[in-house]
């Protein structure tokens, strides 16, 4: 359980509370969560983060009316820099997007401008918004598995700890190689729970690193220990990044978690020691 679950900033959220749906554009529905809540807990300095990256969201339930009242639908891609002040709370994001349903816009560019303005304001940093027709969206292509990507889910492990335990990484420095290696790993077994509602969050997590070899069994046990942990998607990924660097002291590290969608949105946090922009990599479960 996160140490900041009872923070005042969280008690103000509509998440976990009964709400009414609004079908007329309402920017005030958006709510933000300070990134500092999690980062203070990790002893991270917002002005000197140990990583770069972004949060990439895809919205599959966005619709509005054109100037003649005819419905228009689109798939939306939203990108927020990890240096922004706030993450966007997902329920408020869903309610906000729903408020476009009965609102008229002259063009898709007008919708993009409104989304960019509102989301940049709530995030505290410039947001990137791209809208695609459902037949012309790069996000809809399922990424092919790289031959270099190793799935660690087949490790024959015994486990009875489903509470977050970073000490499981204490033995993760594999002695099979004294020299540096480069590996691209994936696990589809990451599950955590919403900090407020306790709803399950499911993800495939990709870990690309260069350094001394990481023991796959220890890493898998560590990832599974998030199974009963309550924290937002972005916060879990930053915790994983920091833990891996603390225990494994890697020269390069990139983590990309692809969460399954809820309420028409999927969230995909990307953190890296050296790469700022996440790739297109939609998984089968998204």
Curated annotation (Swiss-Prot):
User: Record-annotated residues binding NADPH?
Assistant: 90-91, 262-263
Where does this one sit in the cell?
Answer: Cytoplasm
Signal peptide, first to last residue: none
Record-level Gene Ontology MF annotations: preQ1 synthase activity
Residues the entry annotates as binding substrate: 88-90, 233-234
Q: Which InterPro entries match?
A: GTP-CH-I_C/QueF, NADPH_dep_7-cyano-7-deazaG_red, QueF, QueF_N, QueF_type2
- What are the record keywords, sorted? Cytoplasm, NADP, Oxidoreductase, Queuosine biosynthesis
Q: Which reaction does it catalyse?
A: 7-aminomethyl-7-carbaguanine + 2 NADP(+) = 7-cyano-7-deazaguanine + 2 NADPH + 3 H(+)
- Coarsely, its chief localization is cytoplasm
Cite a single GO BP annotation.
Answer: tRNA modification
Q: Which residues form the active site?
A: 194 (thioimide intermediate), 201 (proton donor)
The EC number of this protein is: 1.7.1.13
Pathway where it operates: tRNA modification; tRNA-queuosine biosynthesis
Example of a GO cellular component annotation carried by this entry: cytoplasm
Q: Provide an example Pfam family for this protein.
A: QueF_N
According to its UniProt entry, the function of this protein is described as: Catalyzes the NADPH-dependent reduction of 7-cyano-7-deazaguanine (preQ0) to 7-aminomethyl-7-deazaguanine (preQ1).
Recorded hits in PANTHER family, A to Z, give:
NADPH-DEPENDENT 7-CYANO-7-DEAZAGUANINE REDUCTASE (PTHR34354:SF1)
User: According to its UniProt record, which protein family does this protein belong to?
Assistant: Belongs to the GTP cyclohydrolase I family. QueF type 2 subfamily.
Subunit and partners:
Homodimer.
Q: What is this protein called?
A: NADPH-dependent 7-cyano-7-deazaguanine reductase
The record's gene field reads queF
